[in-house]
């Protein structure tokens, strides 16, 4: 079956480490607008911001992007995009749903395209991205999520686990997980039906919920890592990059 993708960008106002970060100004535009612009440049399908706040919706609309207002009580971005999908597409026209975090203003369109590739394998439930860790400090940084996976090809892994620790042990590359997901529609429906899992809660990584329920996640390896904005320091770095 051919893939019919839609891009959904979850964006909430209540960030704890960097309040109102979706609206943080970067080169004259709110951060969420930068993400939406990059997603549209990928030209793979309809792009919609799913948000819980009117101020984010207004900012997105001012730059000509589509949005939908969702409930404010969602526990994860996946839950938010699922609500959005059910309301936007009850006819089930879209069978591949890309979840792009709203705090990745440096994401490149080619990386969004690459995130879809593992879904070409009909056995893959969820696709995501990773990149080899080069900086030694990142190997020990708990904010850098590592992928433990078995190689499927030169540029693809099957994920066995995700962790904040330095892993796996021994010689060989370590991979940094990039928080972009491409779900088969039925996989997203299945994922959100499960309660948060034991390891998900412990590691604070929602993708572990899928692995704990025997869902298959394949990882496309790319050359660059988009900078996620979680702190004021991250924001200042991104402002310099996009100046």
Swiss-Prot record:
Source organism, top-level taxon = Bacteria
Q: Where in the cell is it found?
A: Cytoplasm
Q: What class of enzyme is it?
A: transferase
According to its UniProt record, the EC number is: 2.7.7.38
Query: Keyword set for this entry?
Result: Cytoplasm, Lipopolysaccharide biosynthesis, Nucleotidyltransferase, Transferase
Query: What GO cellular component is one of the record's annotations?
Result: cytosol
Query: For this chain's UniProt record, which GO biological process terms are given?
Result: CMP-keto-3-deoxy-D-manno-octulosonic acid biosynthetic process; lipopolysaccharide biosynthetic process
Q: In which pathway does it act?
A: Nucleotide-sugar biosynthesis; CMP-3-deoxy-D-manno-octulosonate biosynthesis; CMP-3-deoxy-D-manno-octulosonate from 3-deoxy-D-manno-octulosonate and CTP: step 1/1; Bacterial outer membrane biogenesis; lipopolysaccharide biosynthesis
User: Do you know which Pfam families this protein is assigned to?
Assistant: CTP_transf_3
Entry similarity comment? Belongs to the KdsB family.
* Database matches in HAMAP family: KdsB
| Protein known as | 3-deoxy-manno-octulosonate cytidylyltransferase
Query: What organism is this sequence from?
Result: Bartonella tribocorum (strain CIP 105476 / IBS 506)
Encoding gene (name): kdsB
């Amino acid at each position: 079956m051919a893939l019919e993708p839609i891009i959904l960008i979850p964006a909430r106002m209540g960030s704890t480490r960097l309040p109102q970060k979706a609206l943080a100004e970067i080169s004259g535009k709110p951060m969420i607008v930068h993400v939406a612009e990059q997603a549209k440049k990928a030209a793979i399908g309809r792009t919609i911001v799913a948000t819980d706040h009117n101020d984010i919706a207004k900012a997105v609309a001012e730059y000509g992007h589509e949005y939908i207002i969702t409930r404010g009580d969602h526990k994860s971005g996946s839950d938010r995009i699922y609500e959005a999908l059910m309301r936007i597409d009850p006819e089930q026209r879209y069978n591949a749903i890309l979840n792009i975090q709203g705090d990745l203003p440096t994401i490149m369109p080619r990386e969004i395209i690459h995130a879809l590739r593992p879904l070409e394998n009909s056995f893959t439930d969820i696709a995501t991205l990773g990149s080899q860790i080069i900086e030694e400090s990142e190997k020990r940084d708990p904010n850098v999520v590592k992928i433990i996976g078995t190689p499927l090809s030169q540029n693809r892994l099957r994920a066995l686990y995700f962790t904040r620790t330095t892993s796996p042990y021994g010689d060989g590359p370590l991979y940094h997980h990039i928080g972009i997901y491409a779900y088969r529609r039925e996989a997203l429906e299945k994922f959100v039906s499960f309660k948060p899992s034991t390891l998900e809660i412990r590691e604070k990584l929602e993708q572990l919920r899928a692995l704990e329920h025997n869902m298959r996640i394949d990882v496309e390896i790319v050359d660059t890592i988009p900078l996620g904005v979680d702190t004021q320091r991250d924001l200042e770095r991104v402002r310099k990059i996009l100046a």
